[in-house]
């Protein structure tokens, strides 16, 4: 499975804006083999990347999206039979997995005229051995506890942690809220995401991870923070080094 595969050099409609941090390039798509499905959370440029989808569309068996987002995929050449759209709380199964589109406090749109035209979501991915949560983007709210009550606990929870500002609290969490949200859903192992690749907010590069780490220690939450491309065994995770201090 790939979730929000953003494997290009820029996360905006204009290439010279929002370039990747120089410390780590994206994993080349040609090196990613045996892709069964892609799960998408919403249609913003840093999550739904046109060049990545073009390279993936003929190598992926199926795409799972919130309501309306499939229209982008179809216009980019993805066959309609390979797209499943789900509303919040809708469930489907795929290759032994239960997939559930869940609420998130965010918004959508790739331009001035299409805001709120497609849905956004967080995702539950439940298999025989592991239960996983992906927060997507969004502000903190009671929906996290509701998701945890319905589908938790989760062996692994990937929590948005980056590209925030106090003025954007309704649509992006602060790092401390990200940890709390991970605990609200019942996450046993938390991983901060959305912080290490692009700069889309005025905070420093390491502010998200340092604050997430500090709050996790205060709340006794188990976390990992692997470098891009690192393989992780969520059943027996190795302690993650503070690799960001080397850059």
Regions found by a protein language model. Give the residues of each.
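Pre-active-site segment of Zn-dependent metallo-hydrolases
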Residues: 1-43, 50-55, 65-68, 109-115, ...
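Glycine/Thr-rich phosphate-binding loops of Rossmann-like dinucleotide-binding domains
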Residues: 11, 48, 73, 109, ...
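Metallo-beta-lactamase
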Residues: 66-130, 211-231, 235-238
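Cap/insert and terminal regions of metallo-dependent hydrolase folds
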Residues: 32, 37, 62-71, 131, ...
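A short C-terminal boundary segment appended to hydrolase-like catalytic domains
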Residues: 235-247
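Short hydrophobic/aromatic-enriched beta-strand-loop microsegments
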Residues: 3, 64, 80-88, 155-160
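Metal-dependent catalytic neighborhoods of phosphoester/phosphodiester hydrolases
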Residues: 49-58, 200-210, 235-236
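Divalent metal-coordination and catalytic microenvironments
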Residues: 4, 42, 49, 99, ...
């Amino acid at each position: 499975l790939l979730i929000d595969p953003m494997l290009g050099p820029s996360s905006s409609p204009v290439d010279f804006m929002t370039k990747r941090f120089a410390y780590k390039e994206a994993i080349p798509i040609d090196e990613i083999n045996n892709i069964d499905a892609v799960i998408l959370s919403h249609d913003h440029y840093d999550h739904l990347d046109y060049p990545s989808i073009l390279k993936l569309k003929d190598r992926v068996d199926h795409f799972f999206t919130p309501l309306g987002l499939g229209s982008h995929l179809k216009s980019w050449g993805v066959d309609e039979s390979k797209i499943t759209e789900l509303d919040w709380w809708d469930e489907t199964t795929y290759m032994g997995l239960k997939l559930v589109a869940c609420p998130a406090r965010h918004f959508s749109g790739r331009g001035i005229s299409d805001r709120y035209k497609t849905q956004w979501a967080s995702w539950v991915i439940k298999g025989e051995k592991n239960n996983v949560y992906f927060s997507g983007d969004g502000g903190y709210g009671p929906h996290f506890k509701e998701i945890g009550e319905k589908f938790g606990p989760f062996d692994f929870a990937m929590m948005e942690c980056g590209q925030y500002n106090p003025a954007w609290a309704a649509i992006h969490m602060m790092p401390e809220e990200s940890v709390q949200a991970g605990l609200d859903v019942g996450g046993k192992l938390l991983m901060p995401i959305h912080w290490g690749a692009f700069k889309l907010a005025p905070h420093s590069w390491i502010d998200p991870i340092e604050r997430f780490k500090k709050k996790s220690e205060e709340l006794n939450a188990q976390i990992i923070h692997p470098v891009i491309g690192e393989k992780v065994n969520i059943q027996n995770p190795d302690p993650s080094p503070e690799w960001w201090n080397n850059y």
